[in-house]
Structure formats: C-alpha cells, structure tokens
Amino acid sequence: MVQRCALVVLLVVAVAAALCSAQLNFTPNWGTGKRDAADFADPYSFLYRLIQAEARKMSGCSN
C-alpha cells in the first residue's frame, strides 16, 4: 500500500512537472516589454478625443 501511494505521488509530481513550464534563463535583450504599449495607445486616445469632440458638437446642435 505504501509503495502504491508513493508511486501515485511520484506520478502526480511527474505530470505536474510536465505541464508546468518556465523560462529559466534571463537576458537583458528582451527589450522594454510592456512599456512599449504607450505607443499603441496613442492612436486610440486620439480617436477617443476626436469622437468626444464630435459628440459635443452634435449635442450642441440638437438643442
């Protein structure tokens, strides 16, 4: 019974190790990562401000 429990525990650990993955080596050449997201947000913020301005103009015309 003890051997069977040990085998089951070993099997569970082996399956968990096979399913898990991680990057073990780190390099400074990864770039800036998520900090570059601001460049992609600029067009969206421009469109948002443009739509807001047009909505204000349209709401002023309906009165």
From Swiss-Prot:
Residues bearing the modification Threonine amide: 32
Keyword Secreted found: yes
Keywords: Amidation, Cleavage on pair of basic residues, Disulfide bond, Flight, Hormone, Neuropeptide, Pyrrolidone carboxylic acid, Secreted, Signal
Location in the cell: Secreted
Chief location category: secreted
PROSITE patterns per UniProt: AKH
Signal peptide (UniProt feature, chain positions): 1-22
One of the record's GO cellular component terms: extracellular region
Molecular functions per Gene Ontology: hormone activity
Domain of life, per lineage: Eukaryota
UniProt xrefs under InterPro entries: Adipokinetic_hormone_CS, AKH/RPCH_hormone
The family this protein is said to belong to: Belongs to the AKH/HRTH/RPCH family.
Chain's role: This hormone, released from cells in the corpora cardiaca, causes release of diglycerides from the fat body and stimulation of muscles to use these diglycerides as an energy source during energy-demanding processes.
Name of this protein: Adipokinetic prohormone type 1
